[in-house]
Amino acid sequence: MDSNTVSSFQVDCFLWHVRKRFADQELGDAPFLDRLRRDQKSLRGRGSTLGLDIETATRAGKQIVERILKEESDEALKMTIASVPASRYLTDMTLEEMSRDWFMLMPKQKVAGSLCIRMDQAIMDKNIILKANFSVIFDRLETLILLRAFTEEGAIVGEISPLPSLPGHTDEDVKNAVGVLIGGLEWNDNTVRVSETLQRFAWRSSNENGRPPLPPKQKRKMARTIKSEV
């Protein structure tokens, strides 16, 4: 196993522990708590994949961080912070909408890269909107936290979420996954639109009908993919 992979996991475990202590003091806002919860799932998945104990890794990560901080000057820290571009966290969904449990009458699931696409194919003839919480850097989608499909009545009928065991995805991965979800929902004569925020930062454009600029050929392909593979 690569040593950098192990040490990276150890540092991530310790930094998560620090963030958890911060949250335990009721100091974290909603985006902070949301990332904390999802990063916990990711660490568990990575720990299982690597065969490493999280508690032991956290202790090792603490030693690594302490060594770095001991060698770090205040001036170097200021320069590092100034050189790192800041990302923004954007929310279409409330914390309640993100954490709400939902159930499917006809569950369908597809894994696309490091993203998991789930939908209820029993849903027909509904108006559906896709909402997402995600981070943005340089005015482009950086990391998808969670995307969910809602009916006008507020019911959740679909979802795209990162797989904890396979961290890392691009904005193209997200756009492809959205295309798959739209194709599957439209197969049952649902009308699907995407939130303006997601359109703006994933596609850098928006349409009046709420549709991302997916070519007709791609949309037909997405629908066939959902029907045959999901």
UniProtKB/Swiss-Prot annotation:
Chain residue ranges for the region called CPSF4-binding: 180-215
One Pfam family of this chain: Flu_NS1
InterPro entries per UniProt: NS1, NS1A, NS1A_effect_dom-like_sf, uS15_NS1_RNA-bd_sf
PABPN1-binding, as annotated region: 223-230
Region of interest: RNA-binding and homodimerization: 1-73
UniProt GO MF annotations: protein serine/threonine kinase inhibitor activity; RNA binding
Keyword presence, RNA-binding: yes
Modification comment: Upon interferon induction, ISGylated via host HERC5; this results in the impairment of NS1 interaction with RNA targets due to its inability to form homodimers and to interact with host EIF2AK2/PKR.
Any GO BP annotation: symbiont-mediated suppression of host PKR/eIFalpha signaling
Known partners and oligomeric status: Homodimer. Interacts with host TRIM25 (via coiled coil); this interaction specifically inhibits TRIM25 multimerization and TRIM25-mediated RIGI CARD ubiquitination. Interacts with human EIF2AK2/PKR, CPSF4, IVNS1ABP and PABPN1.
Stated name of the protein: Non-structural protein 1
Organism: Influenza A virus (strain A/Brevig Mission/1/1918 H1N1)
